[in-house]
Amino acid sequence: MYSMLEHDMKSAVPPTHQSAQGMTQLNGGVTHGSAKPAVNSQQQQSSDPMDKVKRPMNAFMVWSRGQRRKMAQENPKMHNSEISKRLGAEWKLLTDAEKRPFIDEAKRLRALHMKEYPDYKYKPRRKTKPVLKKDNPAAKYPLSAGNLLAAAAAQGSGGSPRMDSYGWGHTGGYPGMQTDALGYSQQLHRYDLSALQYPSAMATAQTYMNGANSYNPMSYSSTPQQPSPVMSMVKPEQVSHSPTGAHSHQRGPLQGDLRDMISMYIPGGDTTDSGAQRGYSNIQQHYLTGTAPLTHI
């Protein structure tokens, strides 16, 4: 019984070994077959042999070949670029008679090169230059006009109050608007100077603009009406500048205007000065006692 089992086991082992050998042969064939296209692709990628051919040397290269070696031995720490600069300077100092043998040697080498490689064509290689970072003008000139305008635009449409006070106008305005603002500020200064020259006319204008203060010593509110600075500056332009009778000449039209104002508030009343004073006294009593005046009914 044991002999039969051993016979069965021995008979079962060789087929597995043969199958393993067959698999290795198949794998080997596959790998061998795949290696051939790789070799062919490398052969196809091989560049033209003419690309490896060097250009023939010119006269300077023929002369500098020996001089470069000599200078490198004398100065072992010198860089190759520095050696080339010095050799170029020395080559320019040579006379035509000294350059003649090297020029003839360069012609001979060129003729030999054309004979060996008749189909040779020089194909210069383009060197990739590193992209240089452009200098930012804003970094160089932080206080330029363009940067100031950009900073003002970033603050919004309102602009900077400091810039507006100097007559620049709103942010982003056109040059015409800016010139108008500058001209307006100059006009204000001109009116201001004229007001300083005529203080009596200035006082009369303030009295006309705030007529209630001339009749009523008390102010009706904590914030009384005050003439705007622009109107107080512009008003002296309209007043006659006669130095002799300026104040007496203006009282007539001013009183007429006050009568018109009184007639607006007190309809049907007398338009004389006494009626105006009674109307203002009644108004004062109204504000003091809180009762409505009945004289105008």
From Swiss-Prot:
<dbReference type="Pfam" id="PF12336">
    <property type="entry name" value="SOXp"/>
</dbReference>
<dbReference type="InterPro" id="IPR050140">
    <property type="entry name" value="SRY-related_HMG-box_TF-like"/>
</dbReference>
<feature type="modified residue" description="Phosphoserine">
    <location>
        <position position="160"/>
    </location>
</feature>
<protein>
    <recommendedName>
        <fullName>Transcription factor Sox-19a</fullName>
    </recommendedName>
</protein>
<dbReference type="InterPro" id="IPR022097">
    <property type="entry name" value="SOX_fam"/>
</dbReference>
<dbReference type="GO" id="GO:0005667">
    <property type="term" value="C:transcription regulator complex"/>
</dbReference>
<keyword id="KW-0217">Developmental protein</keyword>
<dbReference type="GO" id="GO:0000978">
    <property type="term" value="F:RNA polymerase II cis-regulatory region sequence-specific DNA binding"/>
</dbReference>
<keyword id="KW-0539">Nucleus</keyword>
<feature type="compositionally biased region" description="Polar residues">
    <location>
        <begin position="39"/>
        <end position="48"/>
    </location>
</feature>
<feature type="compositionally biased region" description="Basic and acidic residues">
    <location>
        <begin position="1"/>
        <end position="10"/>
    </location>
</feature>
<keyword id="KW-0597">Phosphoprotein</keyword>
<dbReference type="GO" id="GO:0030182">
    <property type="term" value="P:neuron differentiation"/>
</dbReference>
<feature type="region of interest" description="Disordered">
    <location>
        <begin position="219"/>
        <end position="255"/>
    </location>
</feature>
<dbReference type="GO" id="GO:0001228">
    <property type="term" value="F:DNA-binding transcription activator activity, RNA polymerase II-specific"/>
</dbReference>
<keyword id="KW-0524">Neurogenesis</keyword>
<dbReference type="InterPro" id="IPR036910">
    <property type="entry name" value="HMG_box_dom_sf"/>
</dbReference>
<keyword id="KW-0238">DNA-binding</keyword>
<feature type="region of interest" description="Disordered">
    <location>
        <begin position="1"/>
        <end position="52"/>
    </location>
</feature>
<keyword id="KW-0221">Differentiation</keyword>
<keyword id="KW-0804">Transcription</keyword>
<keyword id="KW-0805">Transcription regulation</keyword>
<feature type="compositionally biased region" description="Polar residues">
    <location>
        <begin position="16"/>
        <end position="28"/>
    </location>
</feature>
<dbReference type="Pfam" id="PF00505">
    <property type="entry name" value="HMG_box"/>
</dbReference>
<dbReference type="GO" id="GO:0007420">
    <property type="term" value="P:brain development"/>
</dbReference>
<dbReference type="GO" id="GO:0000122">
    <property type="term" value="P:negative regulation of transcription by RNA polymerase II"/>
</dbReference>
<dbReference type="GO" id="GO:0045944">
    <property type="term" value="P:positive regulation of transcription by RNA polymerase II"/>
</dbReference>
<comment type="function">
    <text>Transcriptional activator.</text>
</comment>
<keyword id="KW-0010">Activator</keyword>
<dbReference type="GO" id="GO:0005634">
    <property type="term" value="C:nucleus"/>
</dbReference>
<feature type="compositionally biased region" description="Polar residues">
    <location>
        <begin position="219"/>
        <end position="229"/>
    </location>
</feature>
<dbReference type="InterPro" id="IPR009071">
    <property type="entry name" value="HMG_box_dom"/>
</dbReference>
<feature type="DNA-binding region" description="HMG box">
    <location>
        <begin position="53"/>
        <end position="121"/>
    </location>
</feature>
